[in-house]
């Protein structure tokens, strides 16, 4: 349904759907506020169950072509290692001295073809970065910038990690 400056989407997952226990009532709102897109999730259930809501929005700040000239910064000293099937191994690895280090703005194209095993597995970037200074409060954790368009995307969250995918 339409709400002021946005839209609210609702979904009910009935008890047993996808073999998960409990009825899960989900509400997602997308709101435009002062040049920002705010996405809020709310879910309630009547039984103990697993719920891991996420967003798979992809941005090309140029408006066309590829994203290799985008500059990305991720405020994270560590990332989660993946196996060859892109499944997390549980191992947390420092970004320092690896092509996974986006603590300072880097062009995506700089290391997208690097021989580093994590990049080779995914044919680009597709990992979770473990964010610095996690305290459960909303804070700025990443930026992407296009010199071509002059558009900068700021990402904020109250969660401990971010998945960065380069459209491999």
What kind of region is each of these model predictions?
Residues 1-168:
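An exposed, glycine/acidic-rich loop-and-rim segment of catalytic or binding clefts
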């Amino acid at each position: 349904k339409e709400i002021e400056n946005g839209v609210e989407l609702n979904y009910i997952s009935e008890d047993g759907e996808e073999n998960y226990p409990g009825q899960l009532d989900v509400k997602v709102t997308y709101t435009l506020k002062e040049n920002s897109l705010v996405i809020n999730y709310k879910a309630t259930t009547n039984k103990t169950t697993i719920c891991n809501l996420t967003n798979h929005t992809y941005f090309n700040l140029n408006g066309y072509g590829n994203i290799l000239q985008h500059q990305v910064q991720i405020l994270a000293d560590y990332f989660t290692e993946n196996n060859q099937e892109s499944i997390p191994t549980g191992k947390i690895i420092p970004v320092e001295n690896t092509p996974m280090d986006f603590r300072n703005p880097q062009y995506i194209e700089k290391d997208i073809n690097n021989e580093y095993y994590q990049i080779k597995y995914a044919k680009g970037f597709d990992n979770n970065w473990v964010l610095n200074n996690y305290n459960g409060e909303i804070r700025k954790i990443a930026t992407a910038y296009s010199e071509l368009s002059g558009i900068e995307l700021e990402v904020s969250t109250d969660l401990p990690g971010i998945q960065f995918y380069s459209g491999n």
